[in-house]
Amino acid sequence: MELEKRIYVGGLSSSIESSDLESRFSRFGSVSNLEIINKSTPVGTIQRFAYLNFRTDEDKWQKCKSYLSNATFKGSKLRIEEARPYYLVKLQQEKKIADLQSTNNDEKNEDHSSKVDLEDPVFHGEIIVPGKHSKNMQVVTDSDVRKDPPRKGWKKGPYGRAIVVLRMYNKNTKKTRFFYPLGKNCLQKLWGRVETNMDNTTAFYDSDHDEYVSYGGKRASRDKIRMQAKLGIKASTQKDDNDFELLNNTTGEIEVTKELNEEQLDALRKKDKDTAASVLAELFGSENTEEIDTVSKTSGVLELDNDSTNNFQKEGLDEQDNLQKEESVHIDVPAEFEAFDERTAVVNVDNLKEMFSSNAQDTSKFSLFGNENGVGEESEMESEIDDRNYETMEEEADGETPLAIVKASSGTKGWPKMFTLPNPSSLFQPGNEDYTSREALESWWSENRLFLTRDYKRKRKDAVKRQRRAHEKRIRLV
C-alpha cells in the first residue's frame, strides 16, 4: 500500500545540496517538492534543514528510516522525522471538509422542512418551534385544569385559572427545573374583586401647596416625602386621632385643627378640673372635698426652687407649733408647671418622720438637710472602726515589698515585667522566658483545634445549597 508523507531532514552541512538528498531518497521511493531552508541563529551561525514529499510503501519507509537516520553524510549527521503537513495544503483540506458538511446539512434541512410541512399542522412559514408538540392541540380552558386529572403540562392557578408549567433546562448541571407561579400577584382576578374606595382614604392632595393634608390638619410636602424615599428613611407610623373625622361629619366639610391660645387653654383646664371635682364628689361626697380645701388654706408652704436649696418657709405660724398642731403640709407646684395645671398635693409630715427616723424619740432631731454642719451625725463606734482600719492599712503598706522592674538581658528581647516580689530576692529571670510548658500547649491545641480551624464560609455555602434544594423539591411536590 502506497504512502505519501512529508519528511523533515535536519543536520545538513553547507556542502550538501538538493541533488545529493534526492539521489539518496530515490532508492526507497519517489521524491517531490524538495526544499532546503537556511535559518540564521542568534549566535550568528546558519542552521540548514530540508522538507520533501516522499511516496513509498510501508516496508521501504521503515528501511529508509533505519539506513539514513543518524547516518553520517559529508561530515554531517542526518536526522530524519515525519513532519506535519504543509499549512497551505492543510487549509485546502479543511475547506473541502467544510464544503462537504454544508452540503449535507442543507440536504437534511430540506428533508426536515418537507416532513414538518406535511406532518405538523401548527407549522407556519419558515418558523420551526423547537421542542415537542402536544398530541392534543385543542385550546386549553380553565375548566380543563379543574378536571381530575387536569390537562398535561398545565396547573391550576390561585383563582382557578390555567397556568402552563415552564421547564428550564440548565446545560451546566444537566437538570430540568419546573417553575410555575402560584403567588397571589401572578394573575389578576377578573371577577369578585374589591376595589379600594377613595372616600375612605385618610388624606387628600392639595394641588395649590403641593402637599398632602390629613383629616386632622397635618400637612406633609411632597418634596419631603421624595427626600425620605431617596435617603431610605421610613415614614413615621404615628396614628392621627382625627383621621376618621369625616365619617362623623354630616356636612362633609373638613375641619382643620388650630393652635389654642392661653385663654382657651385656661378654659379647658378649668373645665377638666370641674369634671374631676364632680367625679370626686360623686365618689366620696362633697364633705371630703371641703375638708381638703380647709386644710390647704391653713397649712405650711414648701417651695421647690431650682436655683437655691429647698427650704421650709413659715406662713402664719412658727415651725414647732405647725409640726405639733397641723397634720399636713401644703406643697405648691413650681412656677414652671403652673401653665399646665394648678393643683396641690397633701403630704403627712408624721409619715415622713417615721420613714427617715428609727425611733420616735429622734423626731425632734429629724431634718431633711442633716445637722448644722450639713452632714448627718456619725456614731463614736463607727469613727473608732475607721481609725483602726486606717492604721492596719498603713502597717500593711509599710511591710509591702517595693515594686521591682525586671528587664531582659542584652542577648534576649522582651518587654519588662513589673510585679511585687513576695520576698526580697536578687535573682531576676529574663522578661521573654516562656513559663508555659510544651505539654500544656499541646493539650490545649488538641482540645480547641476543631473550633479554631472550622471553615464557616464553606458550611454557610452548604447550608444555602441545602435550602435551595429543599425549596425546589417543595415546588415540584406542589
From Swiss-Prot:
One GO BP annotation of this record: ribosome biogenesis
Record's keyword annotation contains Phosphoprotein: yes
UniProt-recorded Gene Ontology molecular function terms: RNA binding
Domain of life: Eukaryota
Entry-linked InterPro entries: NOP8_RRM (IPR034138), Nucleotide-bd_a/b_plait_sf (IPR012677), RBD_domain_sf (IPR035979), RRM_dom (IPR000504)
GO cellular component, one term: nucleolus
Ranges where the RRM domain occurs: 5-85
SMART domains hit by this protein: RRM (SM00360)
Key words, A-Z: Nucleus, Phosphoprotein, RNA-binding
Modification type Phosphoserine: residues: 207, 308
Pfam families: RRM_1 (PF00076)
Subcellular location: Nucleus, Nucleolus
Protein's name according to its UniProt entry: Uncharacterized RNA-binding protein P16F5.06
Organism (species): Schizosaccharomyces pombe (strain 972 / ATCC 24843)
